Regions:
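Functionally engaged cysteine thiol sites
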Residues: 19, 25, 46
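A short, exposed loop/beta-hairpin motif centered on an aromatic-Gly-Thr core
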Residues: 23-32
Length: 71
């Protein structure tokens, strides 16, 4: 997947990375490379957490269980 991120230099010199498409998905790093590495981890964690919420909601509402099919 491709996500657009913004990078801004904070007053303390750290680089703040944010993924506007994913509310609250923000990270930082000492330099641009570290900030980008960290925001990739944050995006992965954000997507996983949202997936878990969706799975729980489906199971509670319908008694269904999701399965994963690799294509």
């Amino acid at each position: 997947m491709i996500f657009h991120v913004t990078l801004e230099k904070a007053e303390d010199g750290w680089i703040v990375a944010e993924c506007p498409a994913l509310p609250g998905c923000v990270s930082q790093g000492k330099d641009e490379k570290e900030a980008l590495d960290n925001i990739k981890e944050a995006i992965t964690a954000w997507l996983w957490a949202e997936d878990q919420k969706a799975v729980s909601a489906i199971e509670e509402r319908h008694g269904q269980r999701p399965i994963v099919v690799a294509l």
